[in-house]
């Protein structure tokens, strides 16, 4: 099940990048730019994210959930999702896999959460037949994307607080093929609980500021750099292996 949540995490806000009809492009860009600016300008912002999965025909019957915590200060981000911790600072993106006792180290990789419109212009010609709609009610703005057949996502709905620009909820209607093992799928009324179409909801809550310092993003708590291509885990992570994913390290 984690594979689905990680797929959604990777795709979060990136799915806002496909081509739009010409008359909707500006409105969608403005919507996403509001989100981008809100998170880019936030100082020491933290919040909670709850992921819930349900089958298409029972959207209120959640069969799996995961929760995460995000802390960010402009382009510095820490994301904790169960046993995986990811930190991005000016020098590294650090991914700590606690169950595997592995520290995965690479050059800084900016998340789509901090730059949700970065890929829009370069992807404008990728898809055709995608429709968009923006609605506003009660201080909330909702962007709905309906994708053409043949893609992993059917629909994506994003709701933001119009005053702050912060995400409140993101809903993905998606196909689960390739994300769920065969023995987990419902087949003729038997087998696992997962169907061929599902829904993932991400609910953002508990927004707060000033609860941490820049030390939260420091690589020094995970490792010591001994020289080019040489890193040693700190005492806390002494039984972890460090994997270097970039020759530039």
What are these regions (language model features)?
Residues 69-117:
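An acidic-aromatic
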Residues 1-4:
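Positively charged n-region of N-terminal signal peptides that target proteins for export
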Residues 19-61, 230-249:
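N-terminal leader/targeting segments and the immediate start of mature chains
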Residues 7-16:
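Bacterial N-terminal signal peptides
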Residues 119-179, 244, 248:
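Extended beta-strand-rich segments in extracellular/periplasmic secretory proteins, especially
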Residues 164-249:
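Non-transmembrane domains of secretory- and envelope-associated proteins
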Residues 49-51, 78-82, 142-149:
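Short beta-strand segments that buttress and anchor functional surface loops
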Residues 63-66, 81-82, 89-90, 152-157, ...:
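Short, surface-exposed coil-to-beta transition loops
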């Amino acid at each position: 099940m984690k594979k689905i949540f990680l797929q959604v995490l990777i795709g979060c806000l990136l799915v806002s990048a496909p081509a739009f009809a010409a008359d909707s492009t500006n409105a969608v860009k403005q919507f996403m730019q509001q989100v981008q600016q809100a998170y880019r300008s936030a100082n020491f912002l933290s919040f909670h994210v709850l992921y819930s999965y349900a089958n298409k025909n029972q959207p209120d019957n959640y069969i799996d959930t995961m929760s995460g915590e995000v802390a960010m200060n402009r382009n510095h981000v820490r994301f904790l999702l169960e046993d995986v911790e990811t930190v991005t600072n000016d020098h590294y993106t650090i991914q700590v896999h606690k169950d595997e006792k592995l520290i995965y180290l690479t050059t800084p990789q900016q998340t789509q959460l901090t730059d949700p419109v970065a890929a829009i212009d370069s992807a404008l010609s990728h898809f055709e037949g995608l429709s968009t709609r923006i609605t506003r009610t009660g201080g909330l703005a909702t962007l709905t994307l309906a994708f053409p057949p043949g893609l992993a996502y059917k629909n994506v709905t994003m709701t933001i607080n119009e005053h702050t620009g912060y995400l409140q909820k993101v809903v993905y209607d998606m196909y689960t093929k390739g994300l769920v093992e065969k023995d987990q799928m419902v087949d003729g009324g038997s087998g696992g609980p997962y169907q061929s179409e599902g829904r993932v909801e991400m609910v953002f809550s508990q927004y707060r500021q000033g609860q941490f310092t820049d030390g939260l993003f420091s690589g020094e708590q995970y490792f010591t750099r001994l020289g080019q291509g040489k890193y040693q885990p700190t005492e806390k992570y002494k039984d972890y292996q460090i994997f270097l994913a970039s020759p530039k390290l």
